[in-house]
Amino acid sequence: MKKAILGKKVGMTQIFSEEGEVMPVTVVKAGPCSVVQKKVEDTDGYNAVQIGFEDKKENKTKKPEKGHFEKAGVNPKKHLTEFELESMENLEVGQELTVEQFEVGDQIDVTGTSKSKGFQGTIKRFKHSTGPKTHGSRFYRAPGSLGSMDISRVFKGQTLPGRMGGNTVTVQRLEVVDVDKENNLLLVKGAVPGPKKGLLKIVDSVKAKS
């Protein structure tokens, strides 16, 4: 991993390619982020960088957090995330990271939290088939059999009703279509996980093809 940044999902729109084809894109406000801490293999056992995104009011920042940010010489941040990087020679504590590190055509991996759907049944949650709708049937949206009579228990992993969504999801090999350096915006081809204003982690793709 060579590039990393935090951002928020603005929404989706569409643009036209040079060939005149309609292209669905997601607008992401990425950065600016500040380097809060560097971890090196000699002292921490691995190489990583901790970056912060979005300023936070000082009166809402706890004392240990204040000391952490003051040591780095940056304003308190709402979001802190650590990324393991191959090379950190060009990164220094207090440095600002922007969308300028990305270029049109780059392939990236975007991680976010999927939209929460609340408590849902098996038909919505796992795409189960419904029961018959006629001839006095009372079996329409029920989950059905959970196992045989002899075992007298339910096996682990059975598809049952429960909380749906709100999971960490990563979409790989998305293409950067445009970079707006003035407004810190990335236009990414396709959809990314999560709702509008959802936090996103953006890194260069581990499966990038040249």
From Swiss-Prot:
Role: One of the primary rRNA binding proteins, it binds directly near the 3'-end of the 23S rRNA, where it nucleates assembly of the 50S subunit.
GO terms under biological process: translation
Gene: rplC
Family: Belongs to the universal ribosomal protein uL3 family.
Keyword Ribonucleoprotein: yes
Pfam family name, one: Ribosomal_L3
Superkingdom: Bacteria
Keywords: Ribonucleoprotein, Ribosomal protein, RNA-binding, rRNA-binding
Subunit details: Part of the 50S ribosomal subunit. Forms a cluster with proteins L14 and L19.
GO molecular function: rRNA binding; structural constituent of ribosome
Official protein name in the record: Large ribosomal subunit protein uL3
Source organism of the structure: Natranaerobius thermophilus (strain ATCC BAA-1301 / DSM 18059 / JW/NM-WN-LF)
HAMAP family hit by this protein: Ribosomal_uL3_B
Gene3D superfamilies documented for this protein: 3.30.160.810, Translation factors
PANTHER family: 50S RIBOSOMAL PROTEIN L3, LARGE RIBOSOMAL SUBUNIT PROTEIN UL3C
Any one of the GO CC terms: cytosolic large ribosomal subunit
Ribonucleoprotein among keywords: yes
InterPro entries registered for this protein in UniProt: Ribosomal_uL3, Ribosomal_uL3_bac/org-type, Transl_B-barrel_sf
